[in-house]
Amino acid sequence: MPTWSRTESFLRDWQSLSPEDRRKFKKAVKNFVADLKTGTFRKGLRVKGIQGAEGIFEMTWAKDGRATFEYGPEVRPKNPDIVWRRCGSHSVLKKP
């Protein structure tokens, strides 16, 4: 099971999400975690690196819902550590 943390930016973004958007994000994270175990992300999550932001990735959780993350140092051996950086609309990609 992966470990995870959230940046202050993520926490601010989270507070601005509607309850429906929070539900959608949580559903996408369940799929994301399942895919981490297999090593291949499903196409619907559209996980990819962000150009110009080395080591930072984006995930799509709704039509205009994006989250950014990076891998942190492993807390538990052989379990990835995910640092959630931002979540919100496509605009979060401007400052991932």
Segments from the language model and where they lie:
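Arg/Lys-rich, positively charged N-terminal/basic patches that mediate binding to nucleic acids
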Residues: 1-30
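Enriched for short, Lys/Arg-rich terminal
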Residues: 1-3, 12-15, 57-96
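Noncatalytic linker/hinge segments flanking ATPase motor cores
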Residues: 2, 23-24, 43-48, 68-71
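Residues that form or immediately flank small-molecule/cofactor binding pockets and catalytic motifs
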Residues: 9, 52, 89
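Generic secondary-structure microfeatures
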Residues: 18, 29, 33-36, 54, ...
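A short beta-strand-loop micro-motif that forms or neighbors metal/cofactor-
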Residues: 26-31, 77-81
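A short, surface-exposed loop/turn module that caps and links secondary-structure elements
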Residues: 33-59
